[in-house]
Amino acid sequence: MEIIFYHPTFDTQYWICELEKQLPGARVREWKAGDNRPADYALVWHPPVEMLQGRALKAVFALGAGVDSILSKLRDHPDMLPLSIPLFRLEDTGMGRQMQEYAVSQVLHWFRRFDDYQALKLASRWQPLPEYRADEFTVGIMGAGVLGAKVAESLQPWGFPLRVWSRSRKSWPQVQSFAGQAELGEFMQGTRVLINLLPNTAETAGIINQTLLAQLPDESYVLNLARGVHVVEEDLLAALNSGKLKGAMLDVFSREPLPQESPLWAHPRVAMTPHVAAVTRPMEAITYIAETISRLERGEPVSGQVDRQRGY
């Protein structure tokens, strides 16, 4: 079995060594420009078109939860990866736990009004504030994939009303489900904390815009953990400046690294991290990929295959 590997920043030799340990008999090599030798599987992140073009592969694995970089290249180069070759993404591999930690910590930060107390501290003011009630602090999650389900599960013990919006209706315990465009407005109107975990598709690009934000209750919060292109940053800033939004926590941006001239840097009600909410953990990812390849070789069912029509 021949496997080609490409990632611009990962420790390639570590991945090759560990993959060969978990897949006895497999030969894994780093792909470099001009390498047209046959391969059975490709493990990639932001791959050059020529890496995949014209190859008779059994499957391609994206080394992250998102596949938008591959799908965007396919729109211009459809022969890069024919539909006959399945494309897989990492379903969890430790990302679920990281998203849980991030989401719970930020929701509690807002619920306990730590942002307000930080502002009071900077103003040298000693002022106890009224508490928020958990049963009135509704958290709405956009996106009902593996990560959305994990985040909802982690928030349940805290007593917040939970709701989810997705393409199709979900039956999650203790979570109110809203489905499709027709129910998006109702979902937004009752949401105090909006958590974005949507996939990056043509339909979801720019979805968090002026029209959508206007439907939130006043003094709501936005937590973006998905992709920067989901948020129209000018509209987000306008909602913050008008008081419609009380705060925003952003892990992803329309341009990364965030340009120095962006007004997001200096905004007092914007907190941010540099796209680190959930990173690929090598050992968990290697184990998942090795197990999935082994199941494919045995002809057994697997999960994680991307529906290219939907984009996730």
Curated annotation (Swiss-Prot):
**CDD domains given in the database record:** GDH_like_2
What is the annotated localization of this protein?
Cytoplasm
- Tell me which domain of life the UniProt entry assigns to the organism this sequence originates from: Bacteria
**Class of the enzyme per the UniProt entry, highest EC level:** oxidoreductase
What the entry lists under Pfam families is as follows: 2-Hacid_dh_C
Fetch the InterPro entries from UniProt: D-isomer_DH_NAD-bd, GhrA_Enterobacterales, NAD(P)-bd_dom_sf
First-listed, main subcellular location of the protein, grouped into a coarse class: cytoplasm
Q: Which GO terms describe its cellular component?
A: cytoplasm
Q: What does the similarity note say?
A: Belongs to the D-isomer specific 2-hydroxyacid dehydrogenase family. GhrA subfamily.
Q: Which HAMAP family match?
A: 2_Hacid_dh_C_GhrA
Role description: Catalyzes the NADPH-dependent reduction of glyoxylate and hydroxypyruvate into glycolate and glycerate, respectively.
Full protein name:
Glyoxylate/hydroxypyruvate reductase A
Question: What species is given as this protein's source?
Answer: Klebsiella pneumoniae subsp. pneumoniae (strain ATCC 700721 / MGH 78578)
Q: What is the lineage of its organism?
A: Bacteria, Pseudomonadati, Pseudomonadota, Gammaproteobacteria, Enterobacterales
